[in-house]
Amino acid sequence: MTEQAARSAVIHTPFIELDKLLKRENLAATGGEAGLLIAADLIQVNGEIERRKRRKLYPGDRVVTDKDRLMVVAEQHQR
């Protein structure tokens, strides 16, 4: 099986909390479900299991689930 490329998760603020990102990107239906996924050690951030649901994610962070791979990126402003 080949490794899939990470898709971009654009944020419009300096950071986003992990549980909110999982909900926003439709990897969890609710905050409760996001918390369960995190508590079950099913989420990795930057290659390590993450157990903090409110972990702050910044541009450049990578999130991996069994369903998807995400790269957190900052919104690009047009000049």
Feature locations, PLM:
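A detector for short, charged/polar N-terminal pre-domain segments
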Residues: 2-16
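A positively charged, amphipathic N-terminal helix/segment that binds anionic biomolecules
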Residues: 7-8, 59-79
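A basic, amphipathic helix-loop patch mediating RNA/tRNA/ribosome contacts
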Residues: 13-59
